[in-house]
Each structure stands twice: as structure tokens, then as C-alpha cells.
Amino acid sequence: MRSLFLILLGLAAVSAIGEWENFKTKFGKKYANSEEESHRMSVFMDKLKFIQEHNERYDKGEVTYWLKINNFSDLTHEEVLATKTGMTRRRHPLSVLPKSAPTTPMAADVDWRNKGAVTPVKDQGQCGSCWAFSAVAALEGAHFLKTGDLVSLSEQNLVDCSSSYGNQGCNGGWPYQAYQYIIANRGIDTESSYPYKAIDDNCRYDAGNIGATVSSYVEPASGDESALQHAVQNEGPVSVCIDAGQSSFGSYGGGVYYEPNCDSWYANHAVTAVGYGTDANGGDYWIVKNSWGAWWGESGYIKMARNRDNNCAIATYSVYPVV
């Protein structure tokens, strides 16, 4: 019996080594020296074990989402939070326009991707600029719904130029402050004219390359998922700020993400709600566009639990632009 146990243990170790080698090949991983590679391998092995144990629970029907290896599975949870989120810890208390209660019937499901209002998933890289990507994604949708043109807009423009409005480039910011800058600036440049660098740089805004403008912005009632649903249905993609602080979030692979340990009011990551629907197994969900590249989640998206007590603060800090 002991011999069989040792054999199985050895096979598991060989399988894990194979996963590590496949990971390095798939994502082109190179490390500075053997010590760094050894450390990254240790981090990867811990994460692989965490993923496998979680997915066993998924197979048993105990949770509604599964996890997977992705391009930052060699980063610790703390490193992911430090480099892939980017919310500053403060909150603007007032809306520019009055908040209004939902008055129109709610559609059963909405997906603005199917209407052509959403650009391909982008990647913020090792820069805490999620706030810029979130603000831009909602504006790209609003601009499309008004003009019929889907234009990829410049996150780098916001990273470099909106510090006077409280944003801190790669060190964090808020989407509503991005809109304040665009309003005062009378526009934001296109992505093609002002490409993303994932660093803080000098402002190079050019009024000749404006891709969209903003006249004002609206914040749906804080913590009210019905108000957020109304906004997504009637206004288009909405910038939302969430609690992405749980270890499971970084390795999300698919399904409806319900995390009981999430906070309903604290947020550390900005993303974009581009629709909603209902899953037969996972229940109601939000369709959320992330900015961590297409390798993450469901081709860069996550289905986040909807109508489950504002799980992960999905409706606490939402805002959409008016163009």
C-alpha cells in the first residue's frame, strides 16, 4: 500500500512538472537566473494545487465557477494585486447628474458585444491603470451608440494627462475622474494616435486626434443592482469598480463568479459591465470586460454573480459617460 502511495505521489509530481514546462512554453516565460525560476516554479506549484482543489469542488457542484492557469500564474496573489489592479482609496460622493430610479421594464438579457459596441479585450500590463481601461471601454460603447462608429480610444492619454483630476497613472485612479478630464479637455485621443505603453509618461494629447468627447457622466444609485441593470440595458456599457482581492479572481476560468468572501463596498479594481444574463446552473450574472488580456477568464471576460447582495461590490461604484 505504501509503495502504491509513493508511485501515485511520484506520478503527481511528474504531472505538475509537465504543467510547469507547458506553462513556460505557452506564455514564453524566461527568468533572469535559476534562483528566480525556482521561486516562480514554487509560486506556480502552489497556485496549481489551489486551482486543482477548487476545480474538484466545481466538479462536485459546490461552486459555480472554475479556475485555470493563465499568463500570470507564476505571480503571487499580492503581486497580481499590486500590478494588475489600480484603485485609489477614496470616493467622490456626488453625481454630476441626478440619479434616477429605473422606470422601464428590464430585458431578460443584454450583451452589447453582440451589438458591436465593445472593442476587443485589451491588456493593461504591469501598470495599475484599470481605471483608464474601464472608463475608456464604457466611453467606446457610448460613442458607438450615438454615432454608429466603434473607435478604440487611448487609455495612455488618460494615464499621462489626468493627474490634475486626482488620477495617479499606473498607481491608480477612478473612472469618474477620467471623465472629468475628458469633459474639461473636450475630448480624448484615439488609441491609434496615442498607443498604450503601460508606463507613466509625459502628456502628448493632440486635439487633432480626438476620437470621442464626453458632456457629462452619471453614477447609478450606489449598491443598487437594479439601477445598474437599468443603466446597462438603456445606456450601454457601464464602468464598475469591484473587489478583486480574493485569490480566486486572478485564476478565474469560467462559470458564474460568486465569492462569499468578497466585500460589498470595498473596491480595488475597475472593469466594465457590458451586459447581463442568467445561467441555468450559476444563476443571474453580469457580463464583465476585464483588462488583463484574452488569456484571462472567458477570453478576457468574467461572469460575475448578479442579484446576490451586491457580491464583490459590483454595483457600489458605477458610472457611465454621456456623449
From Swiss-Prot:
Disulfide bonds join C127-C170, C161-C203, C262-C312. The keyword rRNA-binding does not apply. Optimum pH is 6.0. Unstable at pH values less than 5.0 and remains fully active over a wide alkaline pH range. It is found in: Secreted. It is an enzyme of class 3 (hydrolase). Keywords: Collagen degradation, Digestion, Disulfide bond, Hydrolase, Protease, Secreted, Signal, Thiol protease, Zymogen. The keyword Secreted applies. The active site is at C130, H269, N290. It comes from the Eukaryota. Optimum temperature is 40 degrees Celsius but displays considerable activity as low as 20 degrees Celsius. Thermostable. Retains 60% of initial activity after incubation at 50 degrees Celsius for 2 hours. It holds the Pfam family Peptidase_C1. InterPro entries: Papain-like_cys_pep_sf, Pept_asp_AS, Pept_cys_AS, Pept_his_AS, Peptidase_C1A, Peptidase_C1A_C, Peptidase_C1A_papain-like, Prot_inhib_I29. One of its GO terms (biological process) is digestion. SUPFAM superfamilies: Cysteine proteinases. Cysteine protease which may be involved in digestion. Shows highest affinity for proline at the P2 position. Cleaves valine more efficiently than leucine and exhibits 10-fold lower affinity for phenylalanine than proline. Can cleave type I collagen. PANTHER family: CYSTEINE PROTEASE FAMILY C1-RELATED. Belongs to the peptidase C1 family. This is Crustapain. The lineage of its organism: Eukaryota, Metazoa, Ecdysozoa, Arthropoda, Crustacea.
